[in-house]
Amino acid sequence: MAINSSHHFCPMTTTTTTSAKFVDSLGSSFCKFHGTSSSISLRSYRFGFSFMKNVKRLSCEGSSSSSSSRNENWNRTQKQNQFRPSKVVLNRRKDERFSDLGVISGENSSRSGDVGGGSGSSSTMEKIVEKLKKYGFVDEDQFQDKEVEQERRIEKSSVEERFYVEERRGGFSEESPFGVYGGNDEVKFPWEKVSSMEKKELVNGEWTAKKESRYSLAEMTLSEFELNRLRNVMFRTKSKMRVTGAGVTQAVVDAIQEKWKGSEIVRLKIEGSSALNMRRMHEILERKTGGLVIWRSGTSIALYNYKGGSNRDGSGNMNKQVYRRAERLPSSLPTSTVDQSVQLVNLPQLEKEPTVVGNKDRTSPQEVEYEDEINELLEGLGPRYTDWQGGYPLPVDADLLPGIVPGYEPPFRALPYGVRSTLGTKEATSLRRIATVLPPHFALGRSRQLQGLATAMVKLWQKSLIAKVALKRGVQLTTSERMAEDIKRLTGGMLLSRNKDFLVFYRGKSFLSLEVGEALMEKEMLVRTLQDEEEQARLRASSALVVPSIKANQQLARTLQDKEEQARPSALVLPSTKANQNLVSAGTLGETLDATGKWGKNLDNDDHVEEMKQEVEKVRSAKLVRKLERKLAFAEKKLLKAERALAKVEESLKPAEQRTDLEGITEEERFMFQKLGLKMKAFLLLGRRGVFDGTVENMHLHWKYRELIKILVKAKTLEGAQKVAMALEAESGGILVSVDKISKGYAVIVYRGKDYKRPTTLRPKNLLTKRKALARSLELQKREALIKHIEAIQTRSEQLRAEIEQVELVKDKGDETLYDKLDMAYSSDEETEETDGEEDDVYLDTYEDEGEDDEEGGIQANGSLSETDVEFGSDESDTDFGDNSASSTTPETTFVELQNEELDVQP
């Protein structure tokens, strides 16, 4: 018996006895639970039952007296509730037989509650379906067999009432449905896809959104049969032509044309930077070769020699080619009424201009006129760069322009009154945005001799605010920064932006057109001419006043010369100025003689000249001596300060003495230990800190698993390495086996001994900690540098004393070459002495109270370095364990070059 979800479970009286008992038991159970609805579990489904007014038929006579009272209460409650009939729920699940039976799955029942139990509210999906059927969006025939013909009332405050959309803007009504009208008055949702019938009409049933939005030029030009044939031919073609990073050059185009003579298909393999944008390479190949790309996958392209028209030339205008090709396309392409976007088929976007099939006016006359004007302008600037990988128009090849233009000068500029020379932020941003979409005007590949490019840019600036220069890829020894500076210097323009691909120049607010510049230059030349004439007139007027007194001046000059000869022993000449009171003496000989007599000395005396030279030599020598003495005193002061700091650091350093009761080993054992130690992969690296507590701790940790330990020391000399080895032997208690020279420095092999016992304290207390060892290393380095500096100053001072003695020898005749050499050698500025402070003491105080818990890196047995320190140092004091031969930071103390040689095993 099929049970529909909208029917109520009311068994008829004509049933069998078994069914009657089932109904009686069912009614008694309903009376017992006082429920308005119930459900019976059947596997994973539940039967929903609703009770109407005829629920009174379910008798409860078999129950006890207590159950009869409960039945009366239940009937009274049932009369008050007056349950409404439930709605039909549209079940779109696969198991439709359960929905026909009124069965709802367990997971649905958990979400929707007792949908079939007679509740007044229905599911939201049912309301949506009813609304769609009401306005004709859903066909009612498919639900006709499943529906129950009964009246349905919209309950107040129901979900459907809340789901209702008012008839207003954005609403949903019959006059203005929430959709669009098709060609046959069919209402379509905006998001509704194309139907199967329309898909078949479009592209033989193979419709995709990608094909709908974008078609290749080959698909629109060739038929489907021809395209499939060409692709089959392409797959049988094995040979491929490589296109390198230079792109589609003229040589590549010629090679493709040559291959087309023997085959109609050419397969290409794109490599390098050109493979980063295959869509762009697709367009470039079609534009330059005149062929059609019939297949493209990854970096592989198949190019077809299309001979559909004689007007398809690879070197012609790209836009005009595409427009003519699009006009020859068949106009019988199917159209769809679904959406306006389906009717538009876009060609490949060339030069960022969409080309639409069926649109006759693809570009406005203004755009075509602008392109023709730019093309004509670039043709007048110079030869084109035919290997340009971008779009149309082709830029001018700046490398073919003359490098040097005779008589070239930067253009004349004049800033208008009240105009700022700099660009504002908004203006610069606007110009940069314009330059982003503009094609480049020039293609440049050299960094020098750019006068020809500057001349062409000035011509371009007559009609354009911006000049865009593209940098050729793959050109060696080119620097965009240098290019930009040279162009800016030659043209006077303003650099807007610079990157690895383009240079953008703004002509500037002071740029003048050719006519205006020539007019202003003529005016400026006229002003200069007038100024020159005025100056000459002034000079003529002043000379007219001086001419009458020329003879008097000549006589005065003779008189002064006579007096000068008479009074030559005297140092000063006191000429008479009474005769000059009535003369114009500015710039005359009399004025010069008067000034010489008052403030000048007689330099004609050779003795006076020699005396002055000797005085200069003495002053120069004394100055050099004082400078070196000051340097020497300052260096000695710093050295004393470094000695105090080093002594302060070494207060806690108490090195152990060499043991006299060492355990001896035979020569055979020493040889074997040396051989085994040099072959060990695990080693301990001794850094610039030298031997401190962490070094000894690592040695004991190493001896826990091995009898030998190999320590690498980068000392300058063998004596320094031996000094470090003896310190390691004394502090660790081991037996020194050997010190060998290897490619990485020196290898110190230490044997732990036959009666070795691990000490209770691995870190000895008489050595420095890690931080104090670093501070000590820095102070040693500073002291060593000061010692070398003092030695250099002393050497220079001795050299200076020898030179002073040489000056005494040439006292009668000055040696100018000697003092010039001294000036070059000692031309450094005088150093200012530093005040005595406690900066170093403050630095050293940071190492006073450090804990003893600083641990050094452990030893790694796989050959990796267990660094006790960052780098090696060999600067040690008298109580140090390293090499005291040099400092680790001065040029004289650089480490010996590592030698790639075999281990030298010493017997």
UniProtKB/Swiss-Prot annotation:
Disulfide bonds: none annotated. The keyword Membrane does not apply. Residues 62-89, 101-123, 824-907 are annotated as: Disordered. One of its GO terms (cellular component) is ribonucleoprotein complex. SMART domains: CRS1_YhbY. It is found in: Plastid, Chloroplast; Plastid. GO terms for molecular function: mRNA binding. Residues 220-316, 421-518, 663-763 form the CRM domain. Residues 70-84, 882-897 have a biased composition (Polar residues). Residues 1-59 form a transit peptide. Keywords: Chloroplast, Coiled coil, mRNA processing, mRNA splicing, Plastid, Repeat, Ribonucleoprotein, RNA-binding, Transit peptide. It comes from Arabidopsis thaliana. InterPro entries: CRS1/CFM2/CFM3 (IPR045278), RNA-binding_CRM (IPR001890), YhbY-like_sf (IPR035920). Binds specific group II introns in chloroplasts and facilitates their splicing. Exhibits non-specific action during plastid rRNA biogenesis; RFC3 prevents unaccurate splicing to improve the accuracy of plastid rRNA processing. Acts on subgroup IIB introns. The substrates of the subgroup IIB also require the CRM domain proteins CAF1 or CAF2, with a simultaneous binding of CFM3B and CAF1 or CAF2. Required for seed development. Residues 621-654 form a coiled coil. One of its GO terms (biological process) is RNA splicing. Disruption phenotype: No visible phenotype under normal growth conditions, but the seeds of the double mutant plants cfm3a-4 and cfm3b-2 fail to germinate. The double mutant rfc3-2 sprt2-1 is rescued for primary and lateral root development, intracellular distributions of plastids in roots, as well as for plastid rRNA level compared to the single mutant rfc3-2. The gene is CFM3B. Interacts with RNA. Part of large ribonucleo-protein particles that contain CAF1 and/or CAF2, and RNC1. Interacts with RFC3 in plastids. This is CRM-domain containing factor CFM3B, chloroplastic. Expressed at low levels in roots and shoots. Residues 828-857, 868-881 have a biased composition (Acidic residues).
